[in-house]
Structure formats: C-alpha cells, structure tokens
A protein has these predicted regions:
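Alpha-helical transmembrane segments and their immediate juxtamembrane cytosolic regions
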Residues: 1-325
Length: 325
C-alpha cells in the first residue's frame, strides 16, 4: 500500500530496478488482498449487523474527509463494501460465491456499455465531478479507483474464505496450489486475449479498469499468498528472532486504519513539505523512502502497544461505534 501510493503521488514512473519490480507486482494486488482479508475478518468476527453499519458510517466519514487531500482514498469504498457485507452475513456460502460472481459480472457489463473515462482527467488523475451526487455515485459504483462493482466481490470472496477451516494444512496447501494455478492461467488468458480489438482493453489484468481477468488474477494471487502465510507461520514462529519480528508485524497489523491515514497525512505530507511530489525522485529513491516509512510506522506501533491496546484511530472507532474504550 505504502509503496504503491507513495510512487503514485510522487509522480514517479516505473523503472528497471528491483524496487520498481516489487512495486509493479504489488500494484492492484495489495489492495485486493486487503479487501479479501477484511472479508475473512468479517466472517471470523461475525459482528452484529448494526455494529457493522456503524463501523461503515465511521469509515465513510473518515474516507470522505480523506478525499479532500487524497483522491485515491479507499476508506469510503470500504464503507460501501461493508454495507454489502451486511446483506450477505447470514447467507449461505453458495450465496457468497454467487454474489461475488454477480458483482464481477455487473462491473464487466457496465464497462462494456458505459464510458469508463467519464469524470476522469487522466493527466492529473483527478475526478472532476466527484463532489456532485451524479459524480459520487458514478465514481463509487462504476469507475472510481475501487468501485463497488466489481470490487465488493473481493469482500464476499474473503467472507467465503473465512468460513473454511483455515487452520488445516490441507486447506492451506489447496489455497496455495489452487490460487497459484488460477493466477497463472488467468495471466496467460489475458496475454492471449488482450490483442483482440473489440474486448482487448477489458482483458487486461491491470487494476483500472478492474475487468474480470484482473478480478480472477488478483483474487487467486491473494488466496495463494494467504495460504502460504498460514502454512509457513508455525515454522517461522519456532525461530526466536523471527517470532519477535512477527510479533512486531502483528502489532502493526492491528493498527492498519491508523497507518493508512498516517501514511497520507504524515508520509505524503512530509514529502510534499520537502517538495518531493513533483516527479524529481528516482524509482529506487521512492522505494527506499517507502521502506523507511514502513519501518518508522512499525516502530511507532511497537512503542504505542506498550501503553495502549489499540491504535489511535482504532480506539476512536471503537469509542464512537461501541461506546467502549
């Protein structure tokens, strides 16, 4: 997330260095993984529908405020995804899969029949009429950075995954192999179809616009990554040094909302104050700046956790939506 967004706002193009290679492969995939993980969390946590709606409202307000300074905000999209999740929480696993397919198909049909460029200034990556009702609905549902159609499919897919026996090694291996094979097959299909003059533009695995092959490739990649992490975590935790590093990462992972907002306000704000959001940085420079910021954020989380159980924004959301500290 930090690698992709820092490079985006710094107006740095991809290069041939290792940092660009890593960032290129994360672009679109990291966001998809986060939404899928949110779905997994929704299944495992099983929040009451009214609590889920209150959390969605909180995220929507924070996200809309964030949109004032960062056009690629994802929080207000998360709010809409969680509203979708509420409608599916008590549905069967088959309904979750049907819902995911339905959101993907609806998004694809909309891309075929509507003009995806409407509202966009691709030179500045700005959305000219977002703050109108028509523009907001179009951006949120159809052609924004992470529109509900089809991106809500990732959340439903994650909810389906959350109902599996994720602690079983057989399930984990199935996730790794199945996800990897589907991702490879989808990329090969994209390479074969992308030259088609009629539908080639929608057969890409790029995240904008999020066509069906992107949804398949990113969803499959996320499943493979999640399965691999679940598989190797017990082995890593057996090593004392790795266990301490994992503990630090777990602490940071519990403060993702805080880190998301902070990487915009503090990270991008610092770069802007230094006059570095003008394309003057090299790809490898913005990569290492991003890595350094992540290290700083992890250190903050570790220090904060010694005094408080939850991150600043996580605690605020809990206080506002549940009345608890």
């Amino acid at each position: 997330m930090v690698l992709v967004n820092f490079r985006l706002v710094a107006e740095v193009s991809s290069g041939s260095d290792i940092g660009s290679l890593i960032t290129d492969n994360l672009e679109g995939r990291a966001a998809a993984l986060f939404v899928i993980l949110a779905g997994v969390g929704a299944s495992l946590g099983k929040p009451a529908w009214h609590l889920a709606l209150r959390r969605a409202l909180f995220l929507f307000v924070i996200g809309m405020l964030n949109m004032l300074i960062f056009d690629a905000d994802i929080l207000h999209f998360y709010a809409l995804y969680f509203i979708v999740a509420v409608a599916f929480m008590r549905k069967s696993s088959n309904w979750l899969l049907l819902g995911a397919a339905g959101f993907t198909l609806t998004g694809f049909v909309a891309q075929l029949v509507l003009n995806f460029d409407t509202g966009w200034n691709w030179h500045t990556l700005g959305y000219v009429d977002f703050w109108t009702i028509e523009g907001f609905l179009r951006h949120s549902l159809f052609n924004g950075w992470h529109p509900v159609f089809p991106w809500a499919a990732f959340l439903l897919w994650g909810m389906w995954l959350g109902r599996l026996k994720l602690g079983r090694w057989t399930v984990q291996i199935g996730m790794v192999l199945g996800g990897a094979l589907l991702a490879i097959a989808t990329h090969k299909a994209s390479a074969a179809l992308i030259s088609d003059p009629k539908i080639g533009a929608l057969m890409s695995t790029d995240p904008v616009p999020a066509g069906p092959l992107y949804m398949l490739a990113s969803g499959a990649t996320a499943v493979a990554v999640l399965g691999a992490l679940l598989l190797i975590t017990p082995l890593l935790l057996a090593l004392p040094l790795i266990r301490r590093l994992c503990d630090a990462m777990i602490v940071a992972g519990r403060q993702t909302l805080t880190h998301y907002v902070a990487h915009i306000l503090i990270g991008m704000g610092t770069l802007e104050a230094l006059g570095r959001l003008d394309g003057s940085l090299q790809p490898i420079q913005i990569f290492w700046i991003s890595i350094a910021y992540c290290a700083f954020a992890a250190l903050f989380s570790w220090l904060w956790s010694h005094k408080f159980k939850r991150g600043p924004l996580e605690a605020t959301m809990r206080l506002i939506t549940e009345g608890k500290t």
